[in-house]
Amino acid sequence: MSKFQNLLRSAVLAAIVIGAAFLCGLRLLEIQIADGSKYLAMTQSTHTATQDIEAARGKIADSTGKILNTNELNCSVKLQKASLESGTENEVIYRILTILMKHGDEWNETLPITRTQPYQFEKDRDNAVDSLKSRMKLGVYATVENCMNALYENYKISDQYEEPMRRCIAGVRYEMELKGFNNNNPYELASGISSDTVLELKELSALMPGMEISEGWNRVYLDGTTAPHIRGTVGAISADKYAELKSAGYKLDDIIGTSGIELALESTLRGERGTREITRNSDGMMISDEITKEPQAGKSVMLTIDSNFQNMVERIVQYHMDFLHSPYYTTAMDANLRGKDTEVGSAVVLDVRDGSVLAMATLPSYDINQLVEDYASVLNAENSPLLNRAINGEYRPGSTFKTITATAGLAEGVIDASSTINCTGRYMYYAPSYTPGCTGVHGSITVQFGLKHSCNIFFYETARRMCIDRLAYWANKFGVGTDLGFELPMSTGRMTSPELFDKLGIEWNASDTIQAGIGQSETLLTPLHLATQAMTIANKGVRYRPHIVKAVYNYDYTKLIEEIKPEVMADFSEGMEDVFAEVHAGMKRVSENANFLMEGGWYNIYDFKGIGKENVCTKTGTPEVIAMTKFNSTIVGFYPADNPEIAFGVCMENSEYSRHVACNIISAYITGEFNPVYDEDGNAVYPLGEKRKTADAEQH
């Protein structure tokens, strides 16, 4: 080949190379400059999701500032539908469950099928099983195997996942469906996860697009046995409640108050959610996390109760029942051992100066934390511990009602301070068809001694002279049969009347008026009504709204938002000074009769405890529950007699000597102590909880 040809070939080859390089350069220039933004977007495609930030729920504290219900930080795993690519759900769930299992963390699912083979329907979950079959479009006789196969097919869970992981994935998918998983409603797969789990999930988050770690709050109940009925609990929102509250901004995964103050003050305690925007690239890696709206914590509440006094009153009620059960309660004290089968009791203490609840005991009770962990065990426990008898137990008031009859009779003028009614032991006005008896033969007595001896005849006649309409009119002023305005849902009770009898389908007789006059017939009151009655008498006709909330604060109690002011519900004090002077004097005389066998002698219980019988106004009752066979024991009263500070109402079911409960409540209020005494076998030893006589205790 000639030299010229070689040069020509080299030139052509060089031209080709240069041309190719030029074309490549042009293309590179086009990519980098002309279409650079296009390809940058392709390599950095992003997705931004909005995530809620849970707000802390307000706290609940007692009157001293002791925290009762509070929060602790809770990390949870959530799935966001907008970030979860269709068809990858099972693999993402598999990866998350693997990490949860590795660190011993639980997850949320309620599939009514056991998690281990051989699979079985869970016991006592018939409704859930029926719902599962219906959702899977299976017949009522479908087996557990039919259900599992339907779940696998419905959610496309292949057999590449071994059992029982395959079943666990199915459980999560089913729960996601139940919870309405969608772009606006993330699914909380697990909550309360450990720090190790959080760390590993974050490290491997790129492999689990749609998975997010969320920080929220768990409700914590401190000292769970203190006033559980008052404080209440929170729980997951139900479908019905969600439908009701959706317009108020609630979501399906929200936690709401379910009982007590948690429920009653839901709108106060609930915070306002915040939001954050999380941006991820096409690989699922987080690019940015920006809070667009800060969450607002809920307001905190301070109650009127002092935990120490509340616990003392609960122990006092329990101790009284324990003593009536014990071998130290002898026939020398009570020939018939009345009350020995008592199991249930309640007591309410009010501040007469503003109506605030100082203590509200109801027994049997429970531990809130046990309720949260094992609801069924508390629900099914003997004597219904979930029932707040202090506000929802309805009882005949018995002779405690005679204080109302006395007030009404004096105010109506059918009796006065010097009026006497002759008690022969039998009321003869309706003879011979109806001749109800009395507890004794008291002779000719005034209203003060009518109260002291609890003379049925005196109050039969007083009620008859008034007629039922006027008696009911005055009873209403004391709150009988009315809504007291209390924060928690409660019974209104009821007052005997012809209208009530008509509703109950009972024939009304004129003689029913006299039974109403002694707190029998169809009159029913709660212990809070009894305490309110006593407060109204102590205040000589002024009835405050009983309330359990003292104040509302910001979240950390550093700023007072609202202080609850006393609210007068009824005021009939004008011109009633002389009327209440007689009623007070009669109630003092009742306290003079409060004697019991202690340490070998009969002592006045109020003197024995150093209170002084002259300082206490009380009225006891023994209302019939079953005619002449079963009785409750009630008492209303206030202390001190002349300048009252507290009022109380007590009802002990199937019991006796509720005055012992009242005496110990007053003593605990004065001293800040209650000292129960039990022997080595757990028997309550002394009637009033201690073997201590004061210098004022005199034998009677």
Identify what each model region corresponds to.
Residues M1-P295, Q318-S346, V352:
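Membrane-proximal periplasmic segments of bacterial cell-envelope enzymes
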Residues Y319-S326, L363-Y366, R589, T671:
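Conserved helix-loop functional segments at active or binding sites
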Residues I561-I564, V661-H700:
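Short, gly/Ser/Thr-rich active-site loops of penicillin-recognizing serine hydrolases
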Residues I67-N69, C75, T279-T292, I305, ...:
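Beta-lactam-recognizing serine transpeptidase/beta-lactamase-like catalytic domain environment
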Residues N90-T98, S191, L199-E203, P228-G232, ...:
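Solvent-exposed, polar/charged alpha-helical surfaces in well-ordered, non-transmembrane soluble domains
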